[in-house]
Amino acid sequence: MREANVYSEIVPHTVTAADIAAKRPAGIILSGGPSSVYEEGAPRLDEGIFELGVPVLGICYGFQVMAVALGGEVAKTGHREYGSTAVRVSAGARGGAGFLLDGQPGDQTVWMSHGDSVAKAPEGFDVLASTDDTPIAAFANDGRKLYGVQWHPEVKHSEHGQAVLENFLHRAAGIPADWNSGNVIADQVAAIRAQVGSGRVLCALSGGVDSAVAAALVHKAIGDQLVCVFVDHGLLRRDEARQVQEDYVSATGVRLITVDAEEQFLAALESVSDPEAKRKIIGREFIRVFERAQADLVAEAASEGDPIRFLVQGTLYPDVVESGGGAGTANIKSHHNVSGLPEDLQFELVEPLCTLFKDEVRAIGRELGLPEVIVGRQPFPGPGLGIRIVGDVTRERLDLLRDADAIVRAELTAAGLDSEIWQCPVVLLADVRSVGVQGDGRTYGHPIVLRPVSSEDAMTADWTRLPYHLLAKISNRITNEVEGVNRVVLDVTSKPPGTIEWE
């Protein structure tokens, strides 16, 4: 939707028609899902949504829910369709008889993922498309502006999927393509000013894109009311602390205070290997450091009559969704931006990016004039290398992982692939010892995992097919140059089922 320059929000299936009406949406899209409409406890929706007079598009499971709700039938046909599937669009549908598939080729490849199928369309609906195993792959009632497709138009594997979405958004729903990063900046600047007023604000700079753009956005809104604090927790990659202090300050001119808290974080993480526990400890210690760091700032602000009450966080939309953002969603894992905060948190949160995806954050950063070295930086988690060590975190393990990570980043840059991949986490399997032969003797070292992934918004991702010669060079350098490592492996898992980070 946002690629079509239309703003959108995600709400749970339990939302009522009245709640939807109160939001005054221009269109509604019902998403796909893994359930069967006939399963006990399968997600349902308030059928009054179809009576609001708002255009609705059902996708995959949403298509089937719509069919059943409006009097159609869904059945287990015995035929399942997963992956690339050939679909045939009717001549009328592609020739201007309706909005949804108008202008599309008669034969095209789409991405399917379903076991059940719509066996009978609701009364008043025209069948628009079919496959060999699915006679009703799309339907429409243009008079009521209700539409559905069995395939997934939102994924790139559906050749003309974006055109389907844009036909629904712009033609059926009549939504103009006028949402862009400039709109977001103006809206957020106004929202920040309304929330903060003349108050003083703290922001943690982690070295990543999210916190950098969040801080720049807040600084644009309130200027010198913002003070940025860079907590060097000792979990950063090589040279990252220096880059934060030099690159960001020179680009924005914001006031930056650096706190060296490495010893505190390492002490708190001692002998802790559980991933969730590490995330929560890191989140907790971040806040504790802030509470101490603010002492001088509070005294300064108090002398000026402006207490510090606000904390900026670079929370993104995927962080909220993955942390279980509503009924019917699963908590995939806690995020440092939305979990692990102590109950006695003394700040009111300012989260200017919490409705945005990573690619949108980068666009806003460029619009704000941040240098490419900052906005083009590969994503790096707030808990840093602490969650890229599978096992407990020690100074020695951090140094080992930094060396391996530096080699990977240098080789990707030299190969000109920085813009081709989303990110490449380098993971140390610290709790695993692998037997090897180096020199004339047997060794027991730790494996290093390479996790190159391609994505646009971090909600889904696929592993990046790096050239074999590059993988060989990276492996040879790591096993020869990083003491304690005798094996390099490649993670070839997509998301889903795996998340991008190992922990």
UniProtKB/Swiss-Prot annotation:
Residues 1-178 form the Glutamine amidotransferase type-1 domain. It catalyses: XMP + L-glutamine + ATP + H2O = GMP + L-glutamate + AMP + diphosphate + 2 H(+). Gene3D superfamilies: 3.30.300.10, 3.40.50.880, HUPs. Its EC number is 6.3.5.2. One of its GO terms (molecular function) is ATP binding. Pathway: Purine metabolism; GMP biosynthesis; GMP from XMP (L-Gln route): step 1/1. ATP binds at residues 206-212. The active site is at residues 60, 152, 154. Keywords: ATP-binding, Glutamine amidotransferase, GMP biosynthesis, Ligase, Nucleotide-binding, Purine biosynthesis. It is an enzyme of class 6 (ligase). GO terms for cellular component: cytosol. HAMAP family: GMP_synthase. Catalyzes the synthesis of GMP from XMP. Homodimer. This is GMP synthase [glutamine-hydrolyzing]. It comes from Leifsonia xyli subsp. xyli (strain CTCB07).
